[in-house]
UniProtKB/Swiss-Prot annotation:
Residues 94-153 bind DNA. This is Homeobox protein ceh-31. Expressed in PVR neurons. GO terms for molecular function: DNA-binding transcription factor activity, RNA polymerase II-specific; RNA polymerase II transcription regulatory region sequence-specific DNA binding. Its main location: nucleus. Pfam families: Homeodomain. Residues 59-76 have a biased composition (Low complexity). It comes from the Eukaryota. The gene is ceh-31. InterPro entries: HD, HD_metazoa, Homeobox_CS, Homeobox_TF, Homeodomain-like_sf, HTH_motif. It comes from Caenorhabditis elegans. One of its GO terms (biological process) is regulation of transcription by RNA polymerase II. Residues 77-88, 235-251 have a biased composition (Polar residues).
Length: 260
């Protein structure tokens, strides 16, 4: 047990003077002296009284001093968001601007496509140079146009494979630009009668009557066998003849013979 310092009781004013306390602190090796220390014997003998009176900085106080809006350092969510942000930005590709063709360019492209469905590299480069376009633009337009052309051609074959779709086939020939243009360009395959094309002896197609090849030639051959004209229309109605008119005609003819 450490001995009591009697000077604390004999000269209390020495310890209450701040100047003397600072001098004593420097002479004792920088040891801290609590200004609020009590002079009770229990407090003087307890070595933990000095440490408990001074609040130590704790991690809780440090964290509370930080701004609540600032993210915590080392947080798993923060690290994951930081790592994923460059990936999300890199995976987003810039969308290419769509090419806008003029009416003249579209007309020339359509005319060229009607003559030649597939272009060689040399022909494509010449066409692009003549129209003021790039080779890639002409190539992309031809690919899209061929896709549309094949889709329109397949629609007619799908309808012909269904025996109950003859009305839909007639509507297709009237409205579908692909088949309308194709049939108008091949009018030599079909006959004409008084400029009023009709269906003569119309036969509803069945699956056995349709060629297996899915091409426009097979469709045209089937339509030619049914005597389809380039413009579908309803047949003319023949003039109606009643029995009374036939009887009157025979009577008038008999009277004319008797007069002779």
């Amino acid at each position: 047990m450490s001995m009591l310092d009697l000077r604390q009781f004999l000269i209390p004013a020495f310890f209450l003077d701040p100047t003397n306390q600072l001098a004593a602190q420097s002479s004792s090796g920088g040891a801290k002296i609590n200004l609020n220390s009590s002079f009770r014997i229990s407090d003087l003998l307890d070595p933990t009284s000095h440490s408990t009176n001074e609040p130590d900085p704790s991690p809780t106080s440090i964290n509370s001093s930080e701004s609540p809006s600032s993210p915590r350092i080392g947080s798993p969510n923060t690290e994951r968001s930081v790592n994923e942000s460059p990936t999300c930005v890199g995976s987003k590709k810039a969308r290419k601007a769509r090419t806008i063709f003029t009416d003249k360019q579209l007309q020339e492209l359509e005319n060229t496509f009607e003559k030649q469905k597939y272009l060689s590299v040399q022909d494509r480069m010449e066409l692009a140079h003549r129209m003021g376009l790039t080779d890639t633009q002409v190539k992309t337009w031809y690919q899209n146009r061929r896709t549309k052309w094949k889709r329109q051609a397949s629609v007619g074959m799908d309808l012909l494979h269904d025996a109950g779709n003859m009305a839909a086939v007639q509507q297709l020939l009237r409205t579908n630009p692909y088949w309308a243009n194709y049939l108008s360009q091949n009018t030599s395959m079909f006959g004409a009668s008084n400029n009023r094309p009709v269906f003569n002896s119309l036969v509803v197609p069945t699956s056995s009557m349709i060629p297996a090849s899915n091409s426009q030639n097979s469709l045209l051959q089937f339509l030619a066998s049914q005597n389809v004209k380039d413009d579908i229309s309803s047949p003319k109605e023949s003039p109606s003849v009643s029995p009374d008119s036939v009887k009157n005609a025979s009577v008038s003819k008999k009277e004319s013979d008797e007069d002779e």
